[in-house]
Amino acid sequence: MTALSEIFVPLHRIIPFSNVEGQGNRSSIFLQGCKLNCLYCHNPETIPRYTESAKLVSLQYLYEQVMEAVPFIRGVTVSGGEPTIHHKKLVPLFKALRSQGLTCYLDSSGFFEFDRVCSLIDVTDKFLFDLKGEGIGLQTLCFDRKNQAGIVPQQVIPERLHIKNDKLERNLQNLAALLPLNKVEEVRLVFLKHFFDAEHLVGKVAQLLRNYPDVALKIIRVHSKGVRDEAGLSAYIPSVEETNALSAYARQCGINKILTIL
């Protein structure tokens, strides 16, 4: 077995103590790299897999950083970027941390290939699972890798689909697969207008969460501060009333554990 000191990942930053990245006080590790290019991304500097500001560190370094925070933490949450692109490398780290009684969470966009990531899923206690939306508007919202500047186009629903439908649907499919495994802590939806039908999506999520009342739905009203095209995105920000109405609709659909962030 390869030693932790011989496996390296690109690190964006570490927060030793955080109470917003899952249950209890946790250490949060932000890795570099994401296959998506979401227009509302507030950490676009983490999208490239390697940058001058990111450090290439060993798993042993990460393990030691986390262990320094014990006994003041319950576990660790690995975020990004998108942590599942490092799935093979994270498995030995999670095994080592769990052997010390720590829980291991993943903060994920949910667009990973489930079968390829199974070994990491097996050693992950919980997912903080992002829902990006649904339908062809996702192509513009999250999948236009050529739009490096993150400029919001005038036409957000594309006339032609360049992404395969199965890739667009992978988000919900992965959520449906993780729920029976008791692997989901919360589902998060960033709510913005016109890119997708938010009520229709919430209805689908309600069907999935029906038998999992302990899984929270977090509805987050998008904001433009810190995004790459603040002026362009501002036209798609829902009002407080619209956001509260979506939360009320989610409750009407049978979801009881809802957190609305305005």
From Swiss-Prot:
Which Pfam families does the UniProt entry name for this protein?
Fer4_12, Radical_SAM
Give the originating organism: Haemophilus influenzae (strain ATCC 51907 / DSM 11121 / KW20 / Rd)
**What cofactor requirement does the entry state?**
[4Fe-4S] cluster
What does the UniProt cofactor note say? Binds 1 [4Fe-4S] cluster. The cluster is coordinated with 3 cysteines and an exchangeable S-adenosyl-L-methionine.
**Quick one: which residues bind S-adenosyl-L-methionine?**
Y40, C41, H42, G81, D130, L131, K132
Lineage of source species? Bacteria, Pseudomonadati, Pseudomonadota, Gammaproteobacteria, Pasteurellales
> Where would one find coiled-coil regions in this protein?
none
Q: From the Swiss-Prot or TrEMBL record, give the protein name.
A: Putative glycyl-radical enzyme activating enzyme HI_0520
The reaction(s) this protein catalyses: glycyl-[protein] + reduced [flavodoxin] + S-adenosyl-L-methionine = glycin-2-yl radical-[protein] + semiquinone [flavodoxin] + 5'-deoxyadenosine + L-methionine + H(+)
Please state which protein family the record places this protein in. Belongs to the organic radical-activating enzymes family.
Instruction: Please list the residues that bind [4Fe-4S] cluster.
Output: C34, C38, C41
Q: Which PANTHER family match?
A: GLYCYL-RADICAL ENZYME ACTIVATING ENZYME YJJW-RELATED, PYRUVATE FORMATE-LYASE-ACTIVATING ENZYME
Q: Where is the Radical SAM core domain?
A: 20-262
